[in-house]
C-alpha cells in the first residue's frame, strides 16, 4: 500500500525485533527490494534489529541505529523438538505408520538420524548463504567481509557503524529528516502503516485469550 500510494514519497521502516522466521524475513526483504525501486526506504532501528530484524534492514537506502541498539546476529538456526526420552520415561509407546522412511523424518517421536541431520544442516547453511549475500549486496560488501562479522555475532549500534552494518547513529526523527531529504521535500507529514482498527483494550486482549508464540 505504501509502495503504490503516489502521495507517499519516502518510507521510514522502524524495526524493533530480535529476529524471527526465515521465510517471513525473506518476504519482507523482497517487498523492500521492490519498493526501493520506486521510492527511498530508510531504516530506523530501535532496541533490537538482530537476525531477521537485520535481514529486513540490510537493503535499505540508509540505516540509522541508536548507540546501544543490538543488531547484527547474521546467522541461522533450526529447532527440531524430540520427545523420545520423555515418552519413554513416562511409559508411553508411540507407533507410527508412514508411506516411506522419509515421511517420518520430522516426527517428534523418533530420534534424529544422521542423514536427516545432514539434510537439515544443508538447508540451514543455504539460508545463511542467502542472508550473507543479501547483506553483501545491500551494504556494498563482499561475501567474505560479511561472513567475517556474521556467524551469529551481535553488535551494538555504535560498533555496527564501524564495521559497515549501519550508516549513522540517530533516532527516528533523524531517519525521518533523512528520508525527507532523499525525497527532496521540506514540508511533510507522517502516516503510520499498518493502521490498526483496534483500541488499546483490543491490543491487550481479553482474559480468555490465550498467549500465542512463534519463532
What does each of the following model-derived ranges do?
Residues 12, 84, 88-163, 167-169, ...:
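Charged, glycine-interspersed solvent-exposed loop segments at helix/strand-loop junctions
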Residues 1, 123, 194-215:
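Intrinsic disorder and flexible/low-complexity segments
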Residues 1-86:
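Cleft-lining beta-strand/loop regions that shape enzyme active-site pockets
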Amino acid at each position: 500500500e505504501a509502495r503504490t500510494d503516489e502521495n507517499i514519497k519516502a518510507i521510514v521502516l522502524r524495526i524493533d525485533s530480535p529476529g524471527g522466521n526465515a521465510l517471513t524475513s525473506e518476504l519482507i526483504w523482497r517487498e523492500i527490494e521492490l519498493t526501493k525501486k520506486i521510492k527511498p526506504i530508510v531504516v530506523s532501528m530501535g532496541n533490537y534489529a538482530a537476525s531477521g530484524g537485520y535481514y529486513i534492514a540490510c537493503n535499505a537506502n540508509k540505516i540509522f541505529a541508536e548507540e546501544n541498539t543490538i543488531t547484527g546476529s547474521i546467522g541461522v538456526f533450526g529447532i527440531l523438538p524430540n520427545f523420545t526420552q520423555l515418552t519413554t520415561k513416562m511409559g508411553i509407546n508411540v507407533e507410527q505408520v508412514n508411506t516411506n522412511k522419509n515421511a517420518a523424518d520430522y516426527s517428534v517421536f523418533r530420534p534424529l538420524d544422521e542423514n536427516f541431520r545432514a539434510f537439515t544442516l544443508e538447508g540451514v547453511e543455504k539460508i545463511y548463504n542467502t542472508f550473507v549475500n543479501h547483506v553483501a549486496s545491500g551494504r556494498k560488501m563482499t561475501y567474505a567481509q560479511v561472513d567475517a562479522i556474521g556467524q551469529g555475532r551481535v553488535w551494538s549500534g555504535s560498533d555496527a557503524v564501524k564495521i559497515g552494518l549501519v550508516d549513522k547513529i540517530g533516532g527516528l526523527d533523524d531517519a525521518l529528516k533523512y528520508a525527507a531529504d532523499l525525497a527532496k521535500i521540506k514540508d511533510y507529514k507522517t502516516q503510520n502503516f499498518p493502521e490498526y482498527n483496534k483500541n488499546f483494550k483490543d491490543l491487550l486482549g481479553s482474559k480468555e485469550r490465550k498467549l500465542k508464540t512463534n519463532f
